[in-house]
């Protein structure tokens, strides 16, 4: 099995390392200038009024800094953060236990918030709006509801699939921030910062070589930095240069556009097996042996953003850029315009 180095998902070891690289305050945070600027205003205003921050929703592809920003919000507000995720909160009682253990002003961070069950969401609505829990006592005709006050808190939700959030839940967030892919300059700066923290000697050209293959994602840039460090140590003099980074990333099968073996497998399946498409998601998932959700949430966003793939009402199609990247000819009778239709 080939290890995937450009997936934005965490491994357990990386979770610990990533925490050490995270900025603690907004002024240290690189990139996302629009979201960062707005957050700074909202945080300063809330602190000035001595109120808890309004509920915040971060959404965007994996690895762009949603968890980091949630921790920064808590740090900037000078409060504690309690972290959990949608799939972990299975029953209303699980959420009630978390909410009743919060202190005034605390941040509750729920990752993958789109995966909360409807029955758990129902408990969350009055908690977000009125800072109360509706507790049902008894059963049947004699059942009654009592309201339990809870501390004022800030809910920070994170999701890769904002479209799956129910409207009532989405409407209760006062601050909604969409996170974008990072530029090469921003990723090079992040790679340089991480290298300093980890005490890794790196040249400017080495930073940019890692950055341009990191798929616009800081988490991937940090992962590639650590793997390139290994090659620099064993195959070089310990310093990450452009040549060392190029050699290492080529050995890891990450090409100069940031595509890895899974991206190539998916794009070449569309080009070679389905004549460029369109092909349905289920058929494509079966053809490459991957889960549909993984294709939609992890693989496709970068390919769509960078013009390698297109979604149409009839399915996925490979774009002209994908054909050029793999040095393939557009099929006879199919114009470049039709690849985008």
Swiss-Prot record:
Short name of any one Pfam family annotated for the protein: AAA_lid_4
Subcellular location: Cytoplasm
HAMAP family the record matches: DNA_HJ_migration_RuvB
Sequence similarity: Belongs to the RuvB family.
UniProt subunit comment: Homohexamer. Forms an RuvA(8)-RuvB(12)-Holliday junction (HJ) complex. HJ DNA is sandwiched between 2 RuvA tetramers; dsDNA enters through RuvA and exits via RuvB. An RuvB hexamer assembles on each DNA strand where it exits the tetramer. Each RuvB hexamer is contacted by two RuvA subunits (via domain III) on 2 adjacent RuvB subunits; this complex drives branch migration. In the full resolvosome a probable DNA-RuvA(4)-RuvB(12)-RuvC(2) complex forms which resolves the HJ.
Notes concerning its domains: Has 3 domains, the large (RuvB-L) and small ATPase (RuvB-S) domains and the C-terminal head (RuvB-H) domain. The head domain binds DNA, while the ATPase domains jointly bind ATP, ADP or are empty depending on the state of the subunit in the translocation cycle. During a single DNA translocation step the structure of each domain remains the same, but their relative positions change.
Protein name: Holliday junction branch migration complex subunit RuvB
Organism: Syntrophotalea carbinolica (strain DSM 2380 / NBRC 103641 / GraBd1)
Gene behind this protein: ruvB
């Amino acid at each position: 099995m080939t290890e995937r180095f450009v997936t934005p998902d965490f491994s357990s070891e990386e979770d610990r390392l990533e925490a050490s690289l995270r900025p603690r305050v907004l002024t240290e945070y690189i990139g996302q200038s629009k979201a960062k600027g707005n957050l700074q205003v909202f945080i300063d205003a809330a602190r000035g009024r001595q109120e808890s921050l309004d509920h915040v929703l971060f959404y965007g592809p994996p690895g762009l800094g949603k968890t980091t920003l949630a921790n920064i919000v808590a740090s900037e507000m000078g409060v504690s953060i309690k972290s959990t995720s949608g799939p972990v909160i299975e029953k209303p009682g699980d959420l009630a236990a978390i909410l009743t253990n919060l202190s005034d002003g605390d941040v509750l961070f729920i990752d993958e918030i789109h995966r909360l069950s409807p029955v758990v969401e129902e408990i969350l609505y009055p908690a977000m709006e009125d800072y109360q829990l509706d507790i049902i006592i008894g059963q049947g005709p004699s059942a009654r509801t009592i309201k339990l006050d809870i501390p004022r808190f800030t809910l920070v939700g994170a999701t890769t699939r904002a479209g799956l959030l129910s409207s009532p839940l989405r409407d209760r967030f006062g601050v909604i921030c969409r996170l974008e892919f990072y530029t090469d300059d921003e990723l090079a700066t992040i790679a340089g910062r991480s290298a300093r923290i980890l005490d890794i000697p790196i040249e400017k050209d080495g930073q940019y070589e890692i950055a341009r293959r990191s798929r616009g994602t800081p988490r991937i840039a940090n992962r590639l930095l650590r793997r390139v460090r290994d090659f620099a140590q064993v195959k070089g003099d310990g310093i990450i240069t452009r040549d060392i980074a190029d050699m290492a990333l080529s050995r890891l099968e990450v090409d100069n556009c940031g595509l890895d073996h899974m991206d190539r497998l998916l794009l070449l399946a569309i080009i070679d097996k389905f004549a460029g498409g369109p092909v349905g998601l289920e058929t494509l998932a079966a053809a490459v042996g991957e889960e549909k959700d993984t294709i939609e949430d992890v693989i496709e966003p970068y390919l769509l953003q960078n013009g390698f793939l297109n979604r149409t009402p009839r399915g996925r199609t490979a774009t002209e850029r994908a054909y050029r990247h793999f040095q393939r000819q557009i099929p006879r009778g199919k114009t470049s315009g039709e690849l985008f239709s």
